[in-house]
From Swiss-Prot:
Complex and partners: Binds to the DNA in the promoter region of WAXY containing the sequence 5'-ACGCACGCTAACGTGA-3'.
Tissues/organs with expression: Expressed in tissues with high cell division activities: in root tips, stem node, panicle, flower and immature seed. Weakly expressed in root and leaf.
Region (Disordered): 46-113, 130-233, 257-315
One GO MF term: DNA binding
PANTHER family: ATP BINDING _ ATPASE (PTHR34449:SF5), RHO TERMINATION FACTOR (PTHR34449)
Basic residues composition bias: residue spans: 59-70
Protein species of origin: Oryza sativa subsp. japonica
Name listed for the protein in its UniProt record: SAP-like protein BP-73
Taxonomic placement: Eukaryota, Viridiplantae, Streptophyta, Embryophyta, Tracheophyta
Keywords: DNA-binding, Growth regulation
Pfam families registered for this protein in UniProt: Rho_N
Composition skew (Acidic residues), residue ranges: 76-86, 295-311
Region (Interaction with WAXY): 338-375
């Protein structure tokens, strides 16, 4: 390896072949020699080639003398080239070679301290570069291992997540299937139970006999009471005359009391006549009492009622027979002023028996006038 002793020095120009140019280009490419000034001037330009070619033509024209000078010239050129090559290859850290026109080296110098320092620096740089390269090579497998471990951990986590998701999906599907199965089983059970109940109901309905038509039993009700059932019957003209005769007899006996009562009575305080009411005669004959005693039931019958009730009797109560000889006296009494002594109820009964309408709303004086006019 050739290093220049000083940055200011330059190699002399060499007029020869192009081999020196290749060496100069190689030296210029070294990183340690770039800051140093190294000038290798190659004068092998096309003009030199032209001069040589012109010389060759001259030698060819000149004859044998020129032929003799040509081998000597070639020998000198070859010697110069060999010396230059040997100098370059022999001295690595030596001083630069200076070539003169005679192509002879002037002197060889011993490598100095600066050159040694440069060589040591170059070695240190190489060692550092090698160490860095080794460190990078060592870091690469570590990083690859770490990445591989991370990738394996990530892949395991992904697998676990996928597995958990799959398990959840499977569990959800199983739950849904179980719910569907339970629903189906419940529905089938309900259908079976309903079908069984329907069959049982139909069988029971078939077994039950049809109910017979409702018939109300005949009632055996009989009313048993001590009071005779007497209903007011419409009084005919014949019956009315008989009743009036009985009333006249009673009126004659109770004349003084009736006159006092008639004076105190007012038409507004008269009670309305009830059609269902029965007037009981004050003086009854012995025959009437006998008939009433016959109609009344015994005490033994009322104390111990039988299982069957007696049907209500619709017979007309017996009326005492009055002689027709009293008709003349009745007519005379009706025509006279005795009507004013009668009560309002008695006057209304007389008006009813004679077929007068609206007697229930009439007052006592009106009834007396009507009856007196009709008489």
């Amino acid at each position: 390896m050739l290093l220049p002793p000083h940055p200011g020095r330059t190699l002399p120009a060499y007029h020869g072949d192009n081999r020196f140019l290749l060496g100069a280009c190689f030296l210029s490419k070294l990183p340690m020699l770039r800051p140093m000034k190294l000038s290798l001037v190659c004068s092998a330009n096309p003009n030199n080639h032209r001069s040589r070619s012109s010389d060759i033509t001259r030698h060819q024209k000149g004859g044998s003398a020129r032929r003799k000078s040509k081998p000597y010239q070639e020998k000198d050129d070859s010697e110069n080239i060999d010396e230059f090559d040997t100098d370059i290859m022999s001295s690595k850290n030596g001083p630069p070679i200076s070539l003169t026109s005679n192509s002879r080296p002037q002197a060889t110098s011993v490598p100095g301290e600066r050159e040694k320092e440069i060589v040591e620096l170059f070695k240190r740089v190489q060692a550092q570069l090698r160490a860095r390269g080794k460190g990078k090579e060592e870091k690469k497998p570590e990083q690859a291992k770490a990445q591989g471990e991370r990738g394996s951990v990530d892949s395991l986590l992904n697998l676990l997540r996928k597995h958990s998701v799959d398990q959840r999906r499977k569990s959800g599907d199983e739950k849904e299937q179980s719910v569907d199965q339970t629903k189906r089983s419940n529905e089938s059970g309900n259908k079976q139970n309903s079908s069984i109940f329907i069959k049982n109901d139909t069988q029971e309905e078939q077994k039950k006999p049809h109910p017979a038509a409702f018939k109300r039993p005949a009632s055996n009700f009989r009313r048993r009471s001590p009071v005779p059932n007497v209903k007011f019957q419409p009084v005919t003209n014949v019956d009315a005359e008989r009743v009036i005769n009985n009333i006249n007899d009673a009126v004659q006996e109770a004349k003084p009391t009736l006159e006092n009562k008639a004076a105190t009575d007012e038409p507004d305080s008269v009670s309305t006549f009830e059609p269902n009411s029965v007037i009981e005669p004050e003086n009854l004959s012995l025959d009437d009492l006998d008939h009433i005693s016959d109609d009344e039931p015994d005490a033994s019958d009322t104390d111990e009622p039988s299982g069957e009730y007696d049907e209500p009797s619709l017979q007309i109560p017996s009326v005492p027979i009055i002689d027709e000889s009293h008709d003349t006296t009745l007519k005379s009494s009706l025509g006279g002023p005795d009507l004013s002594t009668l009560k309002v109820t008695e006057l209304r009964e007389l008006a009813k028996s004679r077929g007068i309408k609206g007697y229930s709303k009439m007052k006592k004086n009106d009834l007396v006038e009507l009856l007196s006019n009709m008489a």
